[in-house]
Amino acid sequence: MKITKKRLSQAVVTGLAALCLPLALQAASDDEHKYHQLFEDNCASCHGSDHGGYLAPALNAETLKGRSPTALRTIIMAGSFDTLMPPFYGKLSDDNIRGLVSHLKLTPKLDNPAWTIDDIKKSIKVYVKDESTLPAKPTFKIDDIDDIIGVAARGKYGRGEGSRAIFINSKTHQKIGEVPTGTAAHIIEYNPANPRWAYVKTDTAEIFKVDLYSMQAVRSVKTGFNGPGIGVSRDGKYILAGSFVPHNAVLLNADTLEPIKTFELEGIDPDGKQVSSDSGMIIGTPFDDIFAIALENAGQVWVIDLKEGFPVTRITNVGRHLHDAFLTHGGRKLMIASYDDSIVAAIDLKDRKIIKKLEAGCVPHVGGGSAVVVDGRTLGFGTNFGDCDKTVVSVWDLDKMEVVKQIPVDGGTESPAAHANAPYVAVDIISKDRRARTVQLIDKKSLEVVKTLDVGGHAYFPEYSADGKFLYISAGYSGDQVVVYDSFSLEKVATIPMESPAGIFSHGRVRYMTRGLSPDELAQRDGDLKGAKK
């Protein structure tokens, strides 16, 4: 009897163990899924869905090795005031914060996750089924559609009610429309062939097709997990969207947002290694029916022809860590920044080759770029993060492709703004102290800093109105407003409240291509911009 009871007890214990083991595994799996989702919902839009970094540092087992869980919890709870990261105390529970820290310290950088053409197709959402029902003209008072300025409002937490594209009449400085985007809006592109359409891309790689006449999204598509890259072709028929995660770009029908073709971004980098690459800048050009895209990690620029098969020309050994760029000479020449080489490479998009590599300060970040014509010369202005002692704005003669001057400024810089009708080039100062509140003004003729504006908050992404009369500046995530200045007197004329404003995009960009040039100058200097092919 005792033996029978003993065997029964053993059987019960064994059975319970067999039952409990999968339950324990399931609980662990459930926890892993829970904290993965917490990361996706609260962190990934800045830190990258693959835990490899994006706007903010990588968060994974390798990068967090040796970091105290207590210190990490403190950062999550309190935020980091000189960055985009807000305090999560009160938004996430203490248990969730502790679990998230543990999850981050155990999770490796993920392999390049897939987001296929079928995934893209399935992600399309249609909000207006019959676009013929949309109004034939704007439903609000505006003299010229180019007077519209769009602002990418991130929202405090990079998602939620404050995340939206906000559109403003730059003559009156009044909001005329808001389009919720769910997650942080990053960039706004306008259709060069049809002024009613805008395309808003978020940090989570969603694209919203926006009707500017009725100020509403008509459809959207998710093109990846992270990455701001987007361009619209000169005929308005195509969009090219690139991702940091996954490492690809997708060609879309600009009307329907249906995917046409994906491009896997990989190649041999300047050091001879075969690499898979993030997408850097993407740009359409008035010069030709092409797109140019930077492969950040491979150091290549690809030129995609918009004809049957969409063939690709690969321009190699451009530079290490390519990011942003701007166009000049009617869109034939591309100026692209190389972070790690501290140069800007000039590329001829007709001949598909590098013209020259120009000195560009330290960690150049040219933003949307700026170029002005002064005394018959086309001058380009290049900002740079300045992660060294050399905090300058580079000025190049874009006709001769040579450095004219490097202008000392108060810190690193991120995005220059210019206009043909305004006297100054505005540059935003990036810093971890009060300098981050400021924007400096460079006189176009003397090439000297002549004034510093104390905008407040975290001032960045200056942009002129289409007529050049007003300068718009985001006061950012600690200012929660856009501040407007008279372009000549530099007096403050308006403030426009919104949650964590970032990039500012004038509708006038489609006419002058690069900020600081005018349509008349382009036509006079470069002839007919409608075609390059003879």
Residue ranges and their predicted role:
Residues L25-L38:
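Electrostatic cytochrome c docking/interface patches
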Residues D130-T139, A184-Y190, N226-R234, G272-I282, ...:
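Repeated scaffold domains used in trafficking and secretory/extracellular systems
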Residues S45, D50-Y54, L59-D111:
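Extracytoplasmic electron-transfer domains, predominantly the class I c-type cytochrome c fold
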Residues I145-D147, N194-R196, D235-K237, F287-D289, ...:
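Short coil/turn segments that connect the beta-strands within blades of beta-propeller domains
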Residues S170-H173, D211-M215, A254-L257, D305-G309, ...:
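Short loop/turn segments that connect beta-strands within beta-propeller blades
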Residues K222-G299, P311-R314:
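Asp-box/WD-like beta-propeller blade repeats and closely related beta-sheet repeat scaffolds
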Residues D130, Q174-V179, Q216-V221, E258-G272, ...:
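A short beta-strand motif characteristic of beta-propeller blades
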Residues A475-K534:
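Blade-level signature of beta-propeller repeat domains, shared across WD40, Kelch, NHL, RCC1
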